[in-house]
């Protein structure tokens, strides 16, 4: 028998309204115990909420949704009372005294909705993303995902793969036909079409992942290069202490900002040098840890000091120590001291931004560069949010499509192509939860709020 769960659906703490949600086959039993009746489905009823001895604990609106016409697909009872935490706790305690009722786990209401086919997995995740959105664009995109925009694109891909799989397997099952299906060009054309279709979805998903998770950008360089001043300029406030004393920043400073809707985690680090001070050495060690985990590095150079701005020395002292795949933007700071104009150029395969963090001249160039470098497009309508697991699944699907193309065009191997298409279908279906593991479901829903 399915379990009946209860939890507070509104945020803990003091508020104008507090809501308790009950979901499961015993929701009507709870209604009879607390309200003395079960409200008509989908009709608001103003009633007292009573304790076991008949004492009125609160009074408010009761709503009943009969299965399957509810968010979870189960019978659902919502009690909307006053938002005092003591009152809500008393009411919750009373409900938990009823046999067969237990406290919901985090995300369990959404999990019920998923298991009852009210939402697919991508839509369920979008609920948490909508709650956690840190910008207007992220909220709008999360709502698009909740409404099924992302799932629709994935399902269209799955349908295309299934159609092609059927065609390929038919050519394998009927080898005596006069027509060589593998060589007639139709399968290759369809396969290339799916590859292009998937690339479009991957591009949108990458944008959605940036919106959801942000990008980690680490500002690094020698002491007194102006790293903290740049952090303040990008943040638009005095987030870091700035002095003329080299080594002022000794620990990692973090600031979360938005550039035209793109979330960035900007991290200011201790100046990189051979330090004798133990505290500074620890700060430098932490700086290298952050650098290794970054999505992009901003390497600060002091343009007023010819030695520190020498790119050949910078390459040997710093750039050579970085992973080759880690993107780096070089910033020549303090152009106000030598009369230079703000500019953007390219040298040795690196983008170089010349600016003044002190006067903010050229800071907009850096902001625009970061947007472009991260592949972020401002103001896209109809986008959706995506998670890292979605990107991983799409990437694996793309890899197997390319392998399948090689099996078809170079080896004429229908059986191997069919297997690659099966794997593609499996990876894509993981996104919406058609094929997934219990461990994955547990990890996803445990990250939700209790009551969602």
UniProtKB/Swiss-Prot annotation:
Q: Which residues bind GTP?
A: 224-229, 243-249, 268-271
User: Which Pfam families does UniProt cross-reference here?
Assistant: MMR_HSR1, MnmE_helical, TrmE_N
TrmE-type G domain segment(s): 214-375
Binding-site residues for Mg(2+), renumbered to this chain: 228, 249
Gene Ontology CC terms: cytosol
Sites binding K(+) sit at: 224, 243, 245, 248
What top-level branch of life does the organism fall under? Bacteria
Name the enzyme's class: hydrolase
Residues the entry annotates as binding (6S)-5-formyl-5,6,7,8-tetrahydrofolate: 21, 78, 118, 452
Q: What is its EC number?
A: 3.6.-.-
Predominant cellular place of this UniProt entry's protein:
cytoplasm
> Where can this protein be found?
Cytoplasm
UniProt keyword annotation of GTP-binding present: yes
User: Keywords for this entry?
Assistant: Cytoplasm, GTP-binding, Hydrolase, Magnesium, Metal-binding, Nucleotide-binding, Potassium, tRNA processing
Please name the HAMAP family in this protein's record.
Answer: GTPase_MnmE
Family to which the UniProt record says this protein belongs? Belongs to the TRAFAC class TrmE-Era-EngA-EngB-Septin-like GTPase superfamily. TrmE GTPase family.
How is the subunit organization of this protein annotated in UniProt?
Homodimer. Heterotetramer of two MnmE and two MnmG subunits.
Describe the function of this protein: Exhibits a very high intrinsic GTPase hydrolysis rate. Involved in the addition of a carboxymethylaminomethyl (cmnm) group at the wobble position (U34) of certain tRNAs, forming tRNA-cmnm(5)s(2)U34.
Record-given protein name: tRNA modification GTPase MnmE
| UniProt source species | Haemophilus influenzae (strain 86-028NP)
């Amino acid at each position: 028998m399915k379990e009946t769960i209860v939890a507070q659906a509104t945020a803990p703490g003091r508020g104008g309204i507090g809501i308790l949600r009950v979901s499961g086959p015993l929701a009507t039993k709870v209604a009879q115990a607390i309200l003395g009746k079960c409200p008509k489905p989908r009709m608001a009823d103003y009633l007292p909420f009573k304790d076991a001895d008949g004492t009125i604990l609160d009074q408010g609106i009761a709503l009943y949704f009969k299965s399957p016409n509810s968010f979870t697909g189960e019978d659902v009872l919502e009690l909307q009372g006053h938002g005092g935490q003591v009152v809500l706790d008393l009411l919750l305690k009373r409900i938990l005294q009823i046999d067969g009722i237990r406290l919901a786990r985090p995300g369990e209401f959404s999990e019920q909705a998923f298991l009852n086919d009210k939402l697919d997995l991508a839509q369920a995740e979008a609920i948490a993303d909508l709650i956690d959105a840190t910008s207007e664009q992220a909220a709008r995109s999360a709502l698009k995902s909740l409404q099924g925009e992302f799932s629709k694109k994935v399902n269209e891909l799955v349908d295309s793969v299934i159609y092609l799989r059927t065609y390929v397997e038919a050519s394998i099952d009927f080898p005596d036909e006069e027509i060589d299906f593998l060589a007639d060009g139709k399968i290759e054309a369809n396969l290339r079409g799916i590859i292009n279709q998937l690339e479009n979805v991957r591009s949108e998903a990458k944008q959605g992942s940036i919106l959801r998770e942000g990008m980690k950008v680490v500002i690094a360089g020698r002491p007194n290069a102006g790293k903290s001043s740049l952090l303040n300029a990008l943040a638009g406030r005095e987030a870091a202490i700035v002095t003329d004393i080299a080594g002022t920043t000794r620990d990692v400073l973090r600031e979360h900002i938005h550039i035209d809707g793109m979330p960035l985690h900007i991290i200011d680090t201790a100046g990189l040098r051979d330090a004798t001070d133990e505290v500074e050495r620890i700060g430098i060690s932490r700086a290298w840890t952050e650098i290794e985990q970054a999505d992009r590095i901003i390497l600060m150079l002091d343009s007023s000091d010819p030695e520190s701005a020498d790119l050949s020395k910078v390459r040997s002292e710093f750039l050579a120590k970085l992973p080759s795949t880690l993107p780096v933007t070089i910033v020549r700071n303090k152009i106000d001291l030598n009369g230079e104009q703000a500019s953007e150029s390219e040298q040795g395969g690196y983008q170089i931004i010349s600016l003044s963090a002190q006067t903010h001249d050229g800071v907009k160039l850096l902001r625009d560069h970061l947007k472009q470098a991260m592949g972020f497009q401002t103001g896209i309508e109809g986008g959706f949010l995506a998670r890292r697991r979605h990107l991983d699944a799409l990437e694996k699907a793309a890899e197997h499509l390319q392998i399948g193309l090689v099996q078809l065009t170079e080896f004429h191997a229908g059986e191997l192509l069919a297997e690659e298409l099966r794997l593609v279908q499996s990876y894509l279906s993981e996104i919406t939860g058609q094929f997934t593991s219990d461990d994955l479901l547990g990890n996803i829903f445990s990250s939700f709020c209790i009551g969602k």
